[in-house]
Amino acid sequence: MKALLIALALAAPAAELRIEKVFGPETPTGRYKHPASITGLKNGDLMLVYYGGEGEYAVDTGVFGAKWSRATGKWGAPRMIAHDPFRSVGNGVVWQAPDGVVWLFYVVRWGSTWSTSRIQGKVSRDGGETWSDSFVVSDKEGMMVRGQPLALDTGEHLLPVYHETGYDTEMVGPDTTSRFLRYDPRKKEMEWRESGVIRSRKGNLQPAVVQLSPKHLVAYCRRGGGYGPAKDGYIVRAESHDGGWTWSEGADAAFPNPNSAVDLLKLRSGSVLLVYNDSMSERTPLTAALSTDGTKSWPHKRNIAEGKNSFAYPFVIQTADGKIHLVFTSDSRTAVNHAVFDEEWVRGAPSGASPPAR
């Protein structure tokens, strides 16, 4: 797979952006490939998952996982790790917890629309090689998952989820809310408890959350409403000051949002990285913004990918070497892309960015 060198900061050779198309329509997991997620494993490898099949609402969908080997520098072939013989599956989130357990959270749709979904899970104790049977994370109708969990200072795990209502596939209603589930791995029982709701004027979903201090959390969420051209579409921002138990009313942030997923990550330096579509109507460009003051201001911004395409569902992590790894989908939801850059690249002077190599 050919990596495309997109930009090079003149000041430092390390400050570059590389994007490769990991899987395309030719990959035999079905033409459709959407919301990808990624995690760093204890041995230095990476693992990504996505759900694929013949279409978003097809009954043949499954969650597929693939690994990047640090030893070879290559991605292995994807294999199915979650499937339901009677129902469609959706968004998958993979995450290695601090104790080494790899979690897979994914959506199972019980009816014809996503508002009939529940959340199921699996765990792996050998780095994603083998997986447990599936179990219920939330059996509440309309609950879905998209964002990566957060390991809190308390030792608990906080899982961002959302509750979608209604049966209109072209509209996200105002009663759709971002929510959180909380789990304490020190307890014997495996129970994810509800922990806070974010409400907003247009509705919101797919929260991405960071912990700025032991009690202070900030979430950026995809807006509700329609998918057509908009003049009033912004990322929804909310805060918690009690460790994620309660949340402020969601308010419009300074960033546009075309009813598309965003991701938020606190870097090792303490800076906060936001990846989003810098448009109210289109899922292009895909942009990175950097805050050095706890999301109060965002002085640095660079496009990761731009052009006539749809660059959607960013999911971003930082590995122990400081590198930032981003996965996103493109090409009418038929391609999964992997971008690698660092904080210095985001701080660099803006320059034109190009779509992934085809």
Predicted regions and their residues:
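Asp-box/BNR beta-propeller blade signature and adjacent active/binding-site loops
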Residues: 14-358
